[in-house]
């Protein structure tokens, strides 16, 4: 801001000149005193310059509606929506989300620094405030087969970007606890630039939390219980209440929030598909859930705005007050969080459930390296899914938990055979992870329980965090067909039955993102999910998103990688038997 800009704002604030915009007849939520106030809102240069009586070049009549600060999603992977940042903005702005803190580690695991650059350049063209945390663990663990490796030196140039707020979720707790050199450098670089550091403490003990706090990690979004939340709060952390397409922890963690500690909590979605964003919303959905569960509405809206802003040092976000950015929501029903108008920097960007802005031309095109990321040299065959077993020895099985990222390690007696065949009666299916980045043929095979498929197979190139191809199926032929379809199309999601392709959603950008509109992807996902009953699927969870997390070897108890079964607590690969 220069001297002329400041003078203009001061003149408008003092009433010496008209404000650019004045909002009248609204009830303003004061998130500091937790009360409603009646006043005009004066806006100049996208910033609130006063609450009181003002005149403006433009006057907006709020018609008695409530005006609250724009919602902030404190931790989200935009790639999980399967659309670009420009399309993601179109999905969340009508729901009142005006700022997101995003970690592009999904695309970074596939395409490295080029993937991060693509996301930042795309974000600059969206009216949504998109701020970035730099991926700290690419790959998620040293043994993982990702498409890139990012060292501290690779991240340093990105700290010059004003959109970058810090270092994203530090999930390799072994590297932190043992003081691994490159991890120490990443942590120090973030603090030397005056940035924040995000945590990822899934299932970790209080002793590890002590280590993370000593490493200057300020928050955690992997909390699933009241007890975990309070333990982190007493050690000085912020805690996020998460509600995504798979991980749904808001109601379990909410009992930890009280009037004394509420300022240390805020909302996030983490991973949410675009169809869920369009139909259900984002942080607005969590506000509604929290109020319905008994949280005071003032606290719910504070969690949705001010608290996240304070955690990340966003001094001009999170409140309707002078000096704050005019990121405002018009709310017709506070308890239901019904957003009728969304303003970003004083500009109306969405009304009555639809965006109302013209997207600037010349969207940033991805590098060719982002469009050629499924590198299986040859099609897979049925023999690639052969799992030899020994009769009489128990098999280690992944037991998935619907709507949770965690799994259970289960031992199941081996059948009387020399090779495992899927057992749909007992819901024991084959799971495969095929490395797709190097061209080397490497396929991890295992057994999973909990999907409930009776026929066919599903597969996707979205498999956190290395994003190799992951598939689950009832027979080898359909597993091969599903994976080969992704090889041919450059990535996406697919469903196969009896050798027939039921439907496929192409994701050509890094095998993670569509080059189509949010609406197009939503419609295509709808067709895909309509086909799932043909496979016998009747679950109340998203099987593709659930499948995508079964390859993440930093969330307990047992996961599947391209190198085979991985015991997260022991932090080592284990045999099937």
From Swiss-Prot:
Claim: Hydrolase is one of the keywords in the record: yes
Cofactor: Mn(2+)
Reactions catalysed: adenine + H2O + H(+) = hypoxanthine + NH4(+)
Keyword Ubl conjugation: no
Alphabetized UniProt keyword annotations: Hydrolase, Manganese
Pfam families in alphabetical order: Adenine_deam_C (PF13382), Amidohydro_1 (PF01979)
Enzyme class: hydrolase
Biological processes annotated in GO: adenine catabolic process
Cited SUPFAM superfamilies: Composite domain of metallo-dependent hydrolases (SSF51338), Metallo-dependent hydrolases (SSF51556)
Gene Ontology MF annotations: adenine deaminase activity
EC number in record: 3.5.4.2
Domain of life: Bacteria
Family to which this protein belongs: Belongs to the metallo-dependent hydrolases superfamily. Adenine deaminase family.
HAMAP family, per the entry: Adenine_deamin (MF_01518)
Protein name: Adenine deaminase
Source organism: Bacillus velezensis (strain DSM 23117 / BGSC 10A6 / LMG 26770 / FZB42) (Bacillus amyloliquefaciens subsp. plantarum)
Record lineage: Bacteria, Bacillati, Bacillota, Bacilli, Bacillales
Gene expressing this chain: ade
